[in-house]
Amino acid sequence: MKLFRCFKPCRGQSSNPHTSESQERNIQTGSPIYTVSSNYQESRTSRMLDFSTSLTPEGLPIFTQTFRQPKTPMPSRITSPKMVIIVNPGSTRCLGVQRQIKTTSTTTPSMRDVWKRLSQL
């Protein structure tokens, strides 16, 4: 009883115009190798280039898939933000604790004389 009847040799063109089927024979083992290649136009989302199936001496299929990473990876919107929006600018307690700024001033004797003259006017 054959379980893998769908892997029998196919001759001619496939019903899908974008795929082609070819039958090769492995020289070392003599077992047939079936290769299905797709001719889809390459896009950013399409990663699958080739899909080939070879049969073991017992007649079981071995699936081999080849993948290619996209040429230009899509930038992550989470790791590269364009702008930061502060929703409630009046609530500064959420952003951090504000410290009071200490100011120190020194007055020289000449400044005291100026203040005296100004206060007498």
From Swiss-Prot:
**Disordered: annotated segments:** 11-30
Q: Which UniProt keywords apply?
A: Host-virus interaction, Inhibition of host innate immune response by virus, Suppressor of RNA silencing, Viral immunoevasion
Tell me the domain of life.
Answer: Viruses
Biological processes per GO annotation: symbiont-mediated suppression of host innate immune response
Q: What does the function comment of this entry state?
A: Pathogenicity determinant. May act as a suppressor of RNA-mediated gene silencing, also known as post-transcriptional gene silencing (PTGS), a mechanism of plant viral defense that limits the accumulation of viral RNAs.
From the Swiss-Prot or TrEMBL record, give the protein name.
Protein AC4
* Family label: Belongs to the geminiviridae protein AC4/C4 family.
**Which regions are flagged for Polar residues bias?**
12-30
